[in-house]
């Protein structure tokens, strides 16, 4: 059993991540199912409160995935409070500054983010290409790791520069 958090309902990226996670889960893990519709909220307190409710209602839940950076630490707090650290998986998009204590305790084993410096550099490279009149199309190389072969769809440029964070590499990031 799993519960998804989609963070801010106004954020298209959160909706896309949630939809993608659900699709992947249905394809790869057909015996796993959602216990509820994706939970909405964009604060650590909201994630904590909702996770407490989900854990109370579905004590056999196996995991949570959060798309807003506030979700994993809020969920992890509820998981620890319920005494279920190690029994309930918690992951999603987060920052080291928010989740390092939960990584160290093992309540969160891994989470993902995009390095804002790399994303900013890629956006500057993209802006430079646009100003020079260069074609922005599938395969465009923005010269930044993870943005060497971007996908372009509906005026949106997608890279593959996510960073998976664990206790092994969390000290590499100071944000």
What are these regions (language model features)?
Residues 1-175:
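A residue-level marker of the well-folded mature domains of exported/periplasmic proteins
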